[in-house]
Amino acid sequence: MLRYEKIFALSLTLFLLYCCSCAQATELTILGPEAFWEVGFSQAHPELKLNHSASEATGQAYLTLLMTSEDYDVFSLPVGPVYMSLLEKGYLLPLSGTVENHAFADSLQVGFQDVLVKDGALYGAPIPSEESLVECVSLGVWTWNQAAWEEEGLGELPATYEELLEQMIYWEQHCEDSPYRLIEADLGAGGFSAAMFQAYVLQYETADGTIDFDTPVFRKAMTLMKTYGEMYQPLDARQALIVPYGGYMTEMGDNVWISPPAFEPGQTAPIPANLQVYAINARTKHPQEAEAYVQAAIQALNEPSLLILTTQAPQEIRSGKQVVLTQAQAQRVQKLSEQAQVNTRSQFLAGDHYYDMEAMIQQYLHGTLPLDQLIYQLNQRAQMAADENER
């Protein structure tokens, strides 16, 4: 009898060990890269196994994937059309209303509350950055090769898109023997034309959510863009004198930064402040574990005040350690940060509308959609977005 008791005890032990191993095998899948702070999270949660995944889908196909897939528990996303569409359409899960979550939401500036908080609930957390000068945020400023620019005798930088596009066209027509390209401008989907479209929206969208694309400045910019597109050489290997949206805070070094061009003389163009966030898939099968992951990311932030970009003195910008800036760099950062805007609730830069509008612009650049028809369709879509915003 004793023998059977030992066998039973051994079997029970093995069964319990098996159950423990099953409990430890809960897999949490993050659509995004590994993070530096996950080592501590994994040590604190041995019952969880973190899997990281990536997707090659883009545009509308990517948005559809995130709206329908149950394979991911947490999304790693830039604040932009995809994130805002998921938030507005209810495909993200709010974090629980704990005192800690409310305190964190209250600590955010308005620009960040606009994208992370909805109806009083916290829906996302900035992704901690190990090295960034401004944690979680990168400024969409432009860089230029000042020495080469002066070497080519180019004078003042173009202050408007019209000046820039005219110079781009002239360069392609007359400077093919130069060792430099004028600008790094990808005209495909998501490239330079999309950046110019987004800049127009950021600059001209009104407070009540309306915008008009049938303006002389937009017509001229699109006409020049199409002219340039007809001579654009995508495989040009020469060094570019201007790199749009290439000067991020993490790459400061000795770069000389310039603000993006405006659409009209005398204007100051807004600078996009790009924010990466974690958000929980509303279809997750592990909501508690996913929330634990996002809350751990919040704890990994150096301090919430580092998210305050537009009012922070440059000398205080740091990431775990004090960053020493030269006086010239500090003044430049301060000037740029005053222009910075986080892409928030623009109806024109969200979801289906944005990707359809971008596709229309590509059709125009490829000669399959006349300019008048492009502007008509853009205004039609803008009106649809405004109507949805009122509902």
Task: Name what the model sees in each region.
Residues 81-139, 259-260:
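Hinge/lid segment of periplasmic solute-binding proteins
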Residues 59-71, 75, 89, 166-170, ...:
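Short helices/loops that flank or line small-molecule/ion binding pockets
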Residues 143, 275-314:
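Bilobed periplasmic-binding protein/Venus flytrap-like ligand-binding cleft at the lobe interface
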Residues 168, 192-194, 204-234:
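Glycine-centered hinge/linker elements that transmit conformational signals in sensory
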Residues 306-363, 388-391:
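Long, aromatic- and glycine/proline-rich binding clefts that accommodate carbohydrate-like moieties
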Residues 84, 196, 219-289:
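Extracytoplasmic/periplasmic substrate-binding proteins
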